[in-house]
């Protein structure tokens, strides 16, 4: 049979997806984290893989789903949080713009799965299934109550789940995980479609969302999930030493306040007394597209006058950041290769060919 007749849509998908194959899985497994450091990789949206000097591996908010894929239904889902926020009826054109850089079914070495909250782009049934099927049978699933309810509903045993709320501390090998207050007001209006938010006092944030501080032997990482800007960041900065802080950044559409702006990201870094602040989430949704260079430009304008003690870092999905080795870098670039050029004799018609 000819190739053009044997190839199907299914064979095409299996041969190209996930786009990075197991490349990043292998890179993470092979990484030897030096003493006094920690390494992390951006998995897209707010997904992070963190690896300590002791070889402890945890993932946070690793999501393997998609956004809109069809114009079929022109209307937003009734009762959606964005509909509640802005009184809209039209479908939100949020298409996923980031490739899948990590294969969940190629994960073998992992010590904990975490989620900050239960929004679809922060917790994933495929990740849960892959870990349950292919990894050690004692890997815990850690998150606020709403996340644990989801995991249990998907079939993760209750005894594998750990509910956390602000103030709780969970030890995973050489990483100490502190659950802290979250400031995700959008989470408070994520309700059943038939439940009204107008005129009703929201229930507590603590069951719905948490921020995390990861204390490793080589430094600390603050993961803010989908939190908006809050004055309370300063309290977290007073109470904890924070080396690297991650904040959800995006260009909010008209009538919407769901992501931090460039000014908010700088205020967050200052309030937390962080050394490095890194925006994320701006990569994933087409309708929240934002240029992180805006953060750096604003930082340059303000840093001397306001005596900032932190630097911004502009990352790329799938890229690695190592603390403290990368603390003075401003931007990430994927490895360019060709570092071994001219280690063998070139095969050219003549030397001046190039």
UniProtKB/Swiss-Prot annotation:
Q: Where in the cell is it found?
A: Cytoplasm
Q: Which Gene3D superfamilies match?
A: Ribonuclease Z/Hydroxyacylglutathione hydrolase-like (3.60.15.10)
Cite the annotated pathway: Cofactor degradation; L-ascorbate degradation; D-xylulose 5-phosphate from L-ascorbate: step 1/4
Q: Does the keyword Cytoplasm apply?
A: yes
InterPro entries in UniProt: L-ascorbate_6P_UlaG, Metallo-B-lactamas, RibonucZ/Hydroxyglut_hydro, UlaG-like_MBL-fold, UPF0173_UPF0282_UlaG_hydrolase
The UniProt entry's GO CC annotations, sorted and at most eight, read: cytoplasm
Q: What sort of enzyme, by top EC class, is this?
A: hydrolase
Per the record, the major location class is cytoplasm
Q: What induces it?
A: Induced by L-ascorbate. Repressed by UlaR.
The UniProt catalytic activity note for this protein reads: L-ascorbate 6-phosphate + H2O = 3-dehydro-L-gulonate 6-phosphate
Q: Does the keyword Hydrolase apply?
A: yes
Q: What HAMAP family would the database entry show?
A: UlaG (MF_01266)
Q: Which family does it belong to?
A: Belongs to the UlaG family.
Under what name is this protein listed?
Probable L-ascorbate-6-phosphate lactonase UlaG
Natural source organism: Escherichia coli (strain SMS-3-5 / SECEC)
Gene it is expressed from: ulaG
